[in-house]
Amino acid sequence: MEQFSAFKLLLKKQYETTLGFYDKYIKNLKRFALKNNVLFVIVDNEFARETLNSNPDIVGLASKLYDDIRAVRFVNEQDFFINLAKLEEDNRETLYQSSGLSKNFTFKNFVVGDGNRRVYEAGVRISETQDADFSPLFIYGETGLGKTHLLQAIGNDKFFHFPNAKVKYVVSSDFAQEVVNAFYQKEKDQGIEKLKAAYESLDLLLIDDTQIFGKKEKTLEILFSIFNNLVSKGKQIVFVSDKTPDELANIDPRMVSRFKSGLLLKIEKHNLSSLCEILAVKLKEKDPNIQITNEAREKAAQISGNDVRSLNGIATKLLFYVKTTKQNLINNDNLKEILFEEFEKFHKKSFDPYLLIENVCRRFNVPVDSVLSENRKAELVRVRDVCNYILREKYKMQFQQIGKIFKRNHSTVVAAVKRVAKMIEKDDSLQDIITSLVI
């Protein structure tokens, strides 16, 4: 308010030769706002507005009191609020454009399962509050489990709850390039300080692929400084990595210590149910009219190698098939034709016996944990035997490997396989079920 009072005095000197102008139109001005380096002032009188807006010297007067001022606009009350709303909207769009986020990654299309529930809950907490209780949050897990999706969803949801928040999503390699670019500026020190100032002004910093930072000493030095500054100001940082902090190669122990100073959470592999749901979400996003049978969806999920990116590729292939053949239904028969390469790759190296076991348990409606336990209930023994049979006869696993999964000895597995072989001789329907379960 003191600055604005001083600004009015400068206007008084500017218009001291215009009789009564200051006393009548300027002296009692009170309502103003400074937005995006533009000073807006409410002036009720149209003559006064036109007079003031046509004076090119006024922005120079304002610049004596306000840093980086680029314009002064005298407006009526209605235009005042319209301009502010427009500037607010523009400011939010500018903030989002500079965030590095993609609107495709949200919590709405993020599938939550047992393997990622804890990191999801931590992410929601970060996005919905201005607290930094978990700073830094360090998320790690194998590639293809949805870590990038989660990281960007945190940023997008933060904007939903706090539209004026300063958020930045950056891949570690891009951050390293920013540091290199800053060093190659004419004024190297100014370039580095400008980079640090930009990052240190953030409310939420999201860094992807943290494991790539290894051997980039200068980059880590800059990151170390930014990290300390943000944490000291109570701001939130989230790191994502394929490895735990202790497994990161060639990284300064001080930085490793910082990574471990907050909340450390792991994203686990998806179960079959989650993979099926993820595939359903991706198909719906690509074309709501695509239909896929439960059996086909389960097989497509199983050959994904527990990789969300692979699932997206599978969904894209299914979309291509639907668009080119005009057939909206994906079933067991055309699935193997569409995903021929994926099935071949799966049989060579990607087979996950636990996904097969989960699929069998779903078919017989029994819990996976019970089948993997010591429980000897007849219905569980039967399902366990079927799993043993499929793993041995259809996927050629060694008896010892199968026994390790079910915590059974060699002879027990052999007996289970023989029991199912005899049951198949008497019951053709069991053979049909087993055939449908084999990928």
Curated annotation (Swiss-Prot):
Residues 100-322 are annotated as: Domain III, AAA+ region. It is found in: Cytoplasm. It holds the Pfam family Bac_DnaA_C. Keywords: ATP-binding, Cytoplasm, DNA replication, DNA-binding, Lipid-binding, Nucleotide-binding. Residues 72-99 are annotated as: Domain II. The keyword Heme does not apply. Transmembrane segments: none annotated. GO terms for molecular function: ATP binding; ATP hydrolysis activity; DNA replication origin binding; lipid binding. Coiled coil: none annotated. NCBIfam families: DnaA, PRK00149.3-3. Belongs to the DnaA family. PANTHER family: CHROMOSOMAL REPLICATION INITIATOR PROTEIN DNAA. This is Chromosomal replication initiator protein DnaA. It comes from Mycoplasma pneumoniae (strain ATCC 29342 / M129 / Subtype 1).
